[in-house]
Each structure stands twice: as structure tokens, then as C-alpha cells.
Amino acid sequence: MGRKLDLSGLTDDETEHVLQVVQRDFNLRKKEEDRLSEMKQRLAEENSKCSILSKHQKFVERCCMRCCSPFTFLVNARRRCGECKFSVCKSCCSYQKHEKLWVCCVCQQARLLRTQSLEWFYNNVKTRFKRFGSAKVLKNLYKKHRLESGACFDILGGGLYEPNLENEGSISGSDSTFYRQSEGHSMMDTLAVALQVAEEAIEEAISKAESQRDSLDKQNEASYLRDHRQELAEELAGTILQRIIRKQKDKADLHAEEEEPECTRPQSSGVKARGEGTAAPPGRHKARAALWRSQSAFSFTTEDTLKTSSAEAAPRQPKDRAQRLLEESALPSWRSMDGLDGKNLVPLLQSPDGNWMTLKDSSRQPPTRLLAKPKSRTFQALEVASSVASAYDELGSDSEEDFDYSEALSKLRPPSQGRLKQPQPQPAQAQSSGQGPLATSPSNPEAMCSDSETSSTSSSREAGCRAKLLWLQRKAPKNPSAEKTHLQGELDVNFNPQAAGGETSDSSDPEETLHTADRRARRWRRARVGPEESNRGLPSPSAYPPALHTAQVSDNVSETDISNEAQNSRSSTDSAEEKLRNRLYELAMKMSEKETSSGEDQESESKTEPKNQKGSLSSEENNQGVQEELKKKCSAVSLCNISTEVLKVINATEELIAESAGPWEIPPVSTDRDNGMFPLGTDQRSLDKQLTSLEENVYLAAGTVYGLEGQLSELEDAARCIHSSTGETELADLEDQVAAAAAQVHHAELQISDIESRISALTIAGLNIAPCVRLTRRRDQKQRSQVQTIDTSRQQRRKLPAPPVKAEKIEASSVTPIKTFNRNFLLQGSSTNRPTASTSNTKDLMEPVLESAVMY
């Protein structure tokens, strides 16, 4: 049964004799089936009756399931059937000696039916062979007869093919079913050809995928095709049959139109042309496009075939010609084959891999003759019948390059005005391919038209596209107000229009930097006035100090802006130091005026202001300059330099306060600290550089830990919001995120411990890192606090500023102390929760502390 059966050498008499034997076998089987059908019907009725009676428990215990007679003691005893497990009487069952059990009459008939119908044999053989016995013999004889008589010339294209008679697929599973379906011979032959072509196409796809061993996607594609070969072949054969039926209907309609009178033919054709031009769906053009193999499968035919095709394509309108050129320019990945005959009239496109050619004009009917010669007549039969020659057309889908990032971004945020004004052409050829969303940029032709891949890779790539879309949605702000704030922060911070457009510029001239800084400040003020007037529900900006607005803006600084600002900050450091020094002098004078006399009038203020009039500007210009420069000093290097200069300015301010207010109580200081002496073997400049680099690392580590703490808090909030219905995949993703965040926190802690060890080594070397207590004065003339001032060196005045403080926390807190460096500095969170160093000093120096917090 599994061997190849060759009946081509039989004579006509032998063939007729074999057919008579097979026919007699079929007649006997038909009679046997009629006889067994009555038995099957009786068994089915009995089974339905038992299923109803078995629902009543009392009936099952007291009566026989077959004859419904009641059980009596010693007269009609109850016996249990060994197969159906029902209780039956003595007359409805028999004892099987070899099995040693009672079997009811219904179960005996079921055994007899299985024995006579040979169901056990056919079920076993069908699992091993798809066609066997008389069906296999009749199939071969029938094919031979059909091919010799020429009845299937229209299906096979007038040529013979070599069928694989060993385990070939068919819709018939046994001899009887094949005999019953032998009447529809034309459709069966068509299905056999379609199945064979589908299997050959799948085999070719597998071999092509296996040839590319360096690609993991191709290997996965080959394994998927091998595992689902039968299902894919059946689906492809069904698609081919649908195309054949559709084409036959089109041919019937065409013949009906040809038979119409000449007077009514132009009107009907015009109506049909208008209907096809307006109401034809995009997928229709793809379904009716004629595809041919090229290079590996076909060789080009003679010139007369091309002339025939060009003659058929010549009567087209100039508008169609222009549309064809537009489609050709929109699809550069397909090479034009119009120059085959030198007349540029055949509208052909060739795929980039050289496996396919297609006609771009799908409105007309395909030519009567093929433009290429097939490698086998099986492909010729398929192409003539169904105009389908590619297994990839049904197996594959869009590749990963078809994922449109512009569509995802358009869903997340509205496009700009410049993009709305630009027209976005969409070629009709790209729309008709049914590839989903098209790329809006004409410079990305690969996203418009890509080769179809298999269903295995398409499903994985579609999942990847969905994952990318979800990733973009997570990155986008979910709240409109948050999005507005984010955009406002970008306008406030990003002062480099070239960098925003994708270009970088280095400004080394200090004068140009000052002019650009003034222009940026004016632009920033104009951009800031609009949102403040539009937000009616929010409090006025005058209710908050300027430093709070600066802190809000600094939270939205992007990484690109920070990198650009770090480059520009060095060139404008001198001007920033002067503005900061003037601003701090003014703040210090205001503090001294409030402390000395709370009831002084404006005349005393006018006396103290001329003392520092040399280095001060107007308060409005200083405020704007401070806000602009503070936004530029977001990098670690700039913060380190600014903190050093600010501490110097605070020193000078405190000295001015001490001179204007009166004598101060200075605690005794050691002699070598007053003289600024360092231990032997140490260099002041090298220690200064090392401490500067350590402070930069501290700033970077503090920012990293602060961001990681925010991520951990968000993850904790998300974990609390998870309900019991959360899927396992979401829980696994959350666990992975928590583990990654914990690993980053651990890495940051290791960096912090390394920095602490280096600081301790510098302390042992003789560098004083711990800050001193600030100079303060008593509110009343009776109480004075001890203040330690050190003017020997810059290293002895170093203090580490607090980590970044959010605007709302700074506004709500009434106490903002200054804290020295310790091991828990980087992990203490907000500065409002830290222990105070001196309660009495906090209220006097709260404004300078707010300024230092904003600078970070």
C-alpha cells in the first residue's frame, strides 16, 4: 500500500478487467453498508434511550435498562454488564466464559458491528496511509483515462505531469468515500493539482529558508513550515480553488458581455469601468494582479510575446501612464522591466530579490499567453487556471520595516503646523498591496513596499510592533497638563535652536555668548507670560519666590539640553559669577536690614544701598539673569564650580554684615589652621583637584540615587494598585523592573561607599572636608551664637549642597537646615526630613539655603 503503483503498462483489456474487479468490490461494499446501517440505527436509538433513563437513579436500581422489567429476588435477579456497566435482567444478557463477565445484548450487537464493518482495520490503516486498496487503483486508472482522453486539458494546460502516487494528499480517506466523490471528477482533479503545487511551493520555501543558515529568522521560518506543512498546503490549495472559481465567474461574465448586442455593449462597459474606478477595493487590484516566476523558475520568451503584450498595453490613456510613473517612483525597491522590448510599453516591475515580476496595470485582463516559460507544466497549469504562482503570497505578511513610527507618534501627540501644511502623497500601488499603514516620509521607501514573509515571522514581528507602540505610549505623558508642563520646560530650558533641530554648534566667543544669552532671556520671558495668563486655576507667580519657578523648570531638563548646557556653561562662567555675586550681595544687605532694625524706614535702606552700588545691577535684570544662568548650571562640573564661588561670596557677605553690625565673638582656632598649613608631603593643588572630582562624582551619584528612588516609589505604587486579576506576564515584568532598579541602587551605593573611602583618605592626608558653623548674630543684643570663619584656604570652606528638592516640598517646608556630609547623605531623600544642625541659625539663613538648593 505504501509503494508506488504504476499502471501505465497495462493494456486496454487488462485495464477493463481491473476496473470490473474494482467495481464489483464497490458494489459489495455498498450492500454491506446498507445492511450495517440498519444495525447502526438500532444501536443509536438504544443509546439515546439509555442516556435518558440513566438520569433516574431509582429506575436504574430497580429495573432493567434494556427491557425495563423490575428486579425480583430469585426470579429475576439483577446482573451488571461488563461493558456499559448498567444493571440488566437475566434474559437481556449472556455470560462470556473466556472473559468471565456478563454482557448485555446491545453491547454484543455493537461488537458484531465493529467486526463486520472492519472499522478497526480501516481506522488503523488510515493513520498510516492516505489512500489504499481499490481507491488507489481506481485513482491511477482514472487519471490515466482522463489524460489520454484529453478531458482535463483545460486544467493541466495541455501537458502531462508526474504525480507522486506514494502517500499523496486527497480529500478521500477510504475507498467508499472516494467512490462516493468520484462523480465530481473535474473539481477533484483541480484540487489534486492545487495540492501538489502548494506542496511544491512550500518545499521550495523551506529549501530557500534553510539555505540562509546565518539568519535566525530564516531558520525559525523553515522549522515552522516543516511543522505546519500539511495545514499550510491545505490553506494554500483552498485559496487556489477560490481564485479558480472567481476566475471562472469572471470568464462567464465576460462571455455574457460579449454575447450582448453591440448597441448596449459600450454603455455596460462604461458603467463597469466607472464602477471599477470608484468602488474597487484596494485588495481587488492585488487579487487580480498577474504574477510570474523570474530568473530561477522562468526564462524570457521570444520577442513576439513581448510585442503582443505591448500591443495590448498600448491603448492606455496618458493619465494612466502618469499614474504608472508615479507608482514607479513611489516603489523604488521594485526594478522597472519596461525596457524589455525597447519600446517602454510593457508595465512590468521586478522584485529586489529577483523572484517575482508583476504587471503594474491591473485594470485590464491578463494576456492570453504567458510572458515566461515555466520550469514545469504543473506551474503552468496553476498559473493558467488561477493566476497565482507564489506560496509567499498567502503564507507571509509585512516585514518589520513596515512598522510606521510616524503613525505611533501621531497617535501620541498632534503634529506640528509645518507638517500639517506638507502634503503626504499615498501611491495607489502601495495602498492596493494591503500592507497596512504607510510611511509618511517619501525618503523611506522600504516601509512602503516590502517583500512578504511567512506567517511565523509575521506574527512575531507584529508582536514586536505592538510592543514598540506600547513602549512609545509609556514614554509619552499621559496627562494633558503634564504634557503641557513638559513642553513648557523644553521651551524654557532648551535655548539652542540648532541643537533642537539636530545640529550642534560650539560658541567660544564670550561676546556672542552674552548677546545670545540676552536674546534667550527675552524669548524665555515671552514664552513664560502666555502659560501663566492661561492657567486661571493656578495661583499667581507672585505668590512664589523666583527660585521655586526655577526649580520647577529644572526638573524638566532633558539629557540633550544638559549636555549642550555643559558645553556652553564654561564660556559664560565669568559673567554668571558676577551676576551671582551681585545678587547675593543684595540679598545679604536685605537680611542685615531686617535683623538690625525691623522698623527702619526707606531712608536707612537708601543709605546702605550705595555701599554696594559698584557691583550691583537693577533687581529685575539680576533676577532674570539668575534664573537664566541657574538653568544652565545643571551639570555636575558647573555645580562644583558654582558652589565654590557661592561659598566665597557668602564669606564676603558675612564679613560685610559683621563690619556693619558690630563686633563678633570668634572662637579660638588652632594655629596651623589659621596659617593654612598642611601636613608634610601634601600638595594643595592636587588635593584641590581630587576634592573637585570627588564632589562631581557625589553630585552625579546623588542625582542617580534620587532618580532611582523615584522609580522605586513608582514601582511600589504600581504594585499596590495591582488586583488579583493581574496576569502572570505583567507580574513578571514588574518583578524584572524591581530587580533592575534594586541592582542599580546597589551599584550606586557601591559608588557612594567608594567616594566616602576616598574622602576619608583625603581627610587623613590633612584636607578638612567637614564644614564649619556659619556666622550668625543674636536677635536680641544679649544672646550671640559662636561663628567660625576660616579665610585661610578654599578647602576649609567646602560644604556639600543638599540634593535636589522639589518645588512643592520647598514651599511647604518652613525649615531648611544645612547639613554636613555623612554616610547617609545620598539616601536621605528630601532635605526637609534631615536633622537640623542648629535651629537658631535656620531662620536667619533660610534664603541663601533656598538659593543653593535651586542651583542643584
Curated annotation (Swiss-Prot):
Gene: Myrip
Segments of skewed composition (Low complexity): 427-437, 450-460
Renumbered residue ranges of the record's region Myosin-binding: 143-560
Zinc fingers, FYVE-type class: 63-105
Quaternary data: Binds MYO5A, MYO7A and F-actin. Binds RAB27A that has been activated by GTP-binding via its N-terminus. Interacts with PRKAR2A. Interacts with components of the exocyst complex, including EXOC3 and EXOC4.
Name of protein: Rab effector MyRIP
Compositional bias annotation for Acidic residues: 395-405
Stretches the record annotates as PKA-binding: 193-209
Region (Negative regulation of PKA-binding): 232-248
Positions of region (Disordered): 251-287, 302-323, 350-376, 392-578, 592-625, 778-805, 826-845
